[in-house]
Amino acid sequence: MSKQCEHGAGILTRRIVPADNSCLFTSVDFVLNDGARVDTDAMQSLRCIIADAVAEDPVTYNEAFLGQPNDDYCIWIKDESSWGGAIELSILSRHYRVEIDVIDTQSGRIDRFGQSENYNTRVLLIYDGVHYDPLVMESADGATVSTVFPTSDDAVLSQAIEIGAEAKSCRQFTDVSNFTLRCLICQTMLRGQKEAMEHGTRTGHANFGEV
C-alpha cells in the first residue's frame, strides 16, 4: 500500500478496489459516494453515462478521436471487459461537475480532468499504469472518511502527489509499454498495451490478463 499522508483533517490513504476491468468506474463511484461502499455493480451506470455522452456528440467524439467509429465505441465501452481511461474520466468529470485528479505512479505526474472548468470540488484517484484506486481522507480515529475536497485545498493535492511519489520510488507501477499480457480468448502472448490494443482491434478480443 502507498504511504499515508497526514492532513489537518485526518490521514490521506489509498483504498483498494477489485483489480478487474472496471476499476476506474468502481473508484469514481466510490469517491462520488463519500466512500460509503465499494460497489462493483455501479460500473454499468457510469459506462452508460459515457456511451450516451459520446453518442450525443459525434462531431467531438469522431473516429479519429476515439480510435474506432462512434457507434462501435458506444457498444465497446458498455462491455464490462473494456478498460476506461482519459476519455472516460473527462466525460465523468463534466457530467458530475467535479475535478477528477489522477496521480500517475509511473511518471509521477498528476492529470487533472476538469481543471479548466473551475469546479468547486475535486476527487482523487491513483493509477499505476494498469489499475485505478481511490484516495480517501480518514479521520484520526478512523470513524469517518472524506472523498470530496474543495479545489482550493492545495494541501490535499500536495499530499496526494506525495503518495504517488512514494509509490514511484518503491516502483509500485506497471510499465504498460513493456509488460506481458495474454489474450484470455486465444492465448496469444502480447507485449505492452499497444500490442494488446492492436490485437483487440484486429480480432475483437477484449479480455486480457497480465502474465
Where are the language model's segments positioned?
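Papain-like cysteine protease catalytic cores
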Residues: S2-G10, R15-G114
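Alpha-helix boundary/capping detector
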Residues: W76, N118-Y119, G209
